[in-house]
Design a protein with these regions (language model features):
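C-terminal motif of bacterial Sec signal peptides marking the signal peptidase cleavage site
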Residues: 14-16
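Surface-exposed, low-hydrophobicity interaction/linker segments
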Residues: 35-72
Length: 234
């Protein structure tokens, strides 16, 4: 019996060590892939800066970044004076937050490029713009609303928009998720909102009266976070 117990302890210890080594090897491999990605980017950044079609640059970046971790998203934008920005996004996947942070932390210093972690909150003009997801499908933030559900320090949201149905739900969900990142800020949205979904706008007046305009979402989340922190201190 004593021998069996010793064997079990040894087995657990070895298994624990193996798991730790595996995690360290995975982290080292990811660091290496990030380093190789940025080395490749530096070697090509002058060419990227001259390309007017950002989609072409984006396609190359996505291809080379796929070795780091699946699920990452990228956005290339021209800012001004020949400077471009590369936004690295977790695309709503919380598990990818450390990878995004590490990639930007390890990014090179290049005068003509700005590297940004997560989609940033945009100005209030976004709430009045129309976002076209396709020729026949659009989102109008000014006509969208939300309903919060707060339970035990958990925030869930139902986002309402006109015209949502089974056929366009997936497209609405992805386009709407990017919109929420732009309205609130991707990092804040991911870390403060536990779950969310998109529903078709109700028609009954009593239901509509319970909803809040979508452009107020950022302020609501700020207040929710402040209240949650206050309760923890108390």
């Amino acid at each position: 019996m004593k021998n069996i117990l010793i064997y079990l302890i040894l087995f657990i210890s070895i298994a624990g060590c193996n798991k730790k080594i595996e995690q360290e090897n995975t982290a080292e491999l990811k660091d290496k892939q990030i380093r190789l990605f940025w080395n490749w980017f530096v070697a090509n950044e002058e060419r990227f800066s001259k390309v007017t079609n950002n989609d072409k640059v984006l396609k190359e970046i996505l291809n080379h970044a796929s070795t780091i971790e699946g699920g990452l998203a990228f956005e290339v934008n021209s800012i001004k004076n020949g400077i471009k920005s590369l936004t690295i996004s977790a695309d709503g996947v919380k598990q990818l937050i450390p990878t995004v942070q590490k990639m930007v932390e390890k990014s090179p210093k290049i005068k003509s490029w700005k590297f940004i972690a997560f989609r940033q909150k945009k100005d209030k003009k976004l709430s009045t713009e129309i976002i076209y997801l396709s020729d026949q499908l659009k989102l109008e933030p000014s006509k969208m609303k939300f309903f919060p559900i707060v339970e035990n320090d958990s925030l869930q949201l139902i986002i309402y928009s006109p015209g949502i149905n089974k056929e366009n739900y997936n497209e609405i969900f992805y386009g709407g998720s990017v919109l929420l990142d732009n309205l609130v800020g991707e990092y804040k949205f991911m870390t403060q909102v536990d779950n969310y979904d998109f529903h078709n706008m109700p028609t009954r007046k009593e239901d509509l009266n319970q909803l809040t305009p979508l452009f107020e979402l950022s302020a609501f989340i700020d207040n929710y976070d402040a209240m949650k922190n206050k309760n923890r201190v108390d």
